[in-house]
Amino acid sequence: MPDARRFIELPGPVRMYRGGELPSVTIAYETWGELRGQGDNALLLFTGLSPSAHAASSMADPSPGWWEYMIGPGKPIDTERFFVIAINSLGSCFGSTGPASINPATGQPYRLDFPKLSVEDIVAAARGACRALGIDHVHTVAGASLGGMDALAYAVMYPGTYRDIISISAAAHATPFTIALRSIQREAVRADPAWAGGNYAPGEGPKDGMRVARQLGILTYRSAEEWLQRFDRERLEGSDDSANPFAMAFQVQSYMEANARKFADRFDANCYLYLSQAMDLFDMAEHGDGSLEAAVRRIDAKRALVAGVTTDWLFPLWQQRQVAELLEHAGVAVSYHELGSIQGHDAFLVDSERFAPMVAEFLAHSS
């Protein structure tokens, strides 16, 4: 299969934000466009929890990426203008070092010997990758969901190394609701006997637990209105299974099951647990001695795009307004958008009619 990934080895030991260290780190990434100068046209893109670095198609890998409508020649993130670097998160399972990677000290996967992961670790690894590529200053730091948290953390941690910020459907910290939700998802994984305390064989693991966790995630990534429009109460053909009183009866169940099985087959369970917890632990106020305002004052961006969706349960609009207001008070020129998509938190992935013009306009006015 085509593979556009490239890899950077960061020398160790790499100290982790909440303690522990890794002897070395590999970061997988993909790029589009041509780098100019010292990186003045570089756009650093962070991903959500589950995607790889394959954000868009390329000559090396023509398969569509997870943000295909957004990245490419003549698209909102125009690769004739920008050099786009998409980073596979530290802790993930698509090429970057994570719990599924081999621990050189043992010759076995790290599993739960992997140190506690934080958003700050993901960001520090991405910063190291940029510097290894000879890029000390990027034009824009961008991301959505976990990637938006990463972008905000990058802005706080490395002032003076970027010009603009794009934060979509993200937040300065997790809420009790999302912490509780992700805790239940992680519990579903750990309650599966196949998790085996994290010591399952490569390629194996708690498929049933991951499937349940993903179904719960899918439910919250979209909105009740969209579920109604897409599926209503449509039943499955031949769903009257007298031998199984709890057999699937509705189209929506079939959709969630198929999506969840696909995810469980491709994503490592321990990596999922670590990345999920990292989202819960993130709090920008830690970079301001407990004060969000003090933390955001470290950000020296010229401009920021902050956007959210009216139907997003996970990162509600009040959190987008909070980020926008904090940035404005810090002297950043903010372009703020509340988008009326019915597609919930995942709208940025699929609602090109709303998101593409917004991003295109913001970047068009960014010199």
Swiss-Prot record:
<dbReference type="GO" id="GO:0006535">
    <property type="term" value="P:cysteine biosynthetic process from serine"/>
</dbReference>
<keyword id="KW-0808">Transferase</keyword>
<comment type="function">
    <text>Transfers a succinyl group from succinyl-CoA to L-serine, forming succinyl-L-serine. In vitro, also has homoserine succinyl transferase activity.</text>
</comment>
<keyword id="KW-0012">Acyltransferase</keyword>
<keyword id="KW-0963">Cytoplasm</keyword>
<dbReference type="GO" id="GO:0009092">
    <property type="term" value="P:homoserine metabolic process"/>
</dbReference>
<protein>
    <recommendedName>
        <fullName>Serine O-succinyltransferase</fullName>
        <ecNumber>2.3.1.-</ecNumber>
        <ecNumber>2.3.1.46</ecNumber>
    </recommendedName>
</protein>
<dbReference type="GO" id="GO:0009086">
    <property type="term" value="P:methionine biosynthetic process"/>
</dbReference>
<feature type="binding site">
    <location>
        <position position="346"/>
    </location>
    <ligand>
        <name>substrate</name>
    </ligand>
</feature>
<comment type="pathway">
    <text>Amino-acid biosynthesis; L-cysteine biosynthesis; L-cysteine from L-serine: step 1/2.</text>
</comment>
<feature type="active site" description="Nucleophile">
    <location>
        <position position="145"/>
    </location>
</feature>
<dbReference type="InterPro" id="IPR029058">
    <property type="entry name" value="AB_hydrolase_fold"/>
</dbReference>
<keyword id="KW-0028">Amino-acid biosynthesis</keyword>
<feature type="domain" description="AB hydrolase-1">
    <location>
        <begin position="41"/>
        <end position="349"/>
    </location>
</feature>
<dbReference type="GO" id="GO:0005737">
    <property type="term" value="C:cytoplasm"/>
</dbReference>
<keyword id="KW-0198">Cysteine biosynthesis</keyword>
<dbReference type="Pfam" id="PF00561">
    <property type="entry name" value="Abhydrolase_1"/>
</dbReference>
<comment type="similarity">
    <text>Belongs to the AB hydrolase superfamily. MetX family.</text>
</comment>
<dbReference type="GO" id="GO:0160210">
    <property type="term" value="F:L-serine O-succinyltransferase activity"/>
</dbReference>
<dbReference type="InterPro" id="IPR000073">
    <property type="entry name" value="AB_hydrolase_1"/>
</dbReference>
<dbReference type="InterPro" id="IPR008220">
    <property type="entry name" value="HAT_MetX-like"/>
</dbReference>
<feature type="active site">
    <location>
        <position position="312"/>
    </location>
</feature>
<feature type="region of interest" description="Important for substrate specificity">
    <location>
        <begin position="48"/>
        <end position="51"/>
    </location>
</feature>
<comment type="subunit">
    <text>Homodimer.</text>
</comment>
<dbReference type="GO" id="GO:0008899">
    <property type="term" value="F:homoserine O-succinyltransferase activity"/>
</dbReference>
<dbReference type="GO" id="GO:0004414">
    <property type="term" value="F:homoserine O-acetyltransferase activity"/>
</dbReference>
<feature type="active site">
    <location>
        <position position="345"/>
    </location>
</feature>
<feature type="binding site">
    <location>
        <position position="214"/>
    </location>
    <ligand>
        <name>substrate</name>
    </ligand>
</feature>
<feature type="site" description="Important for acyl-CoA specificity">
    <location>
        <position position="182"/>
    </location>
</feature>
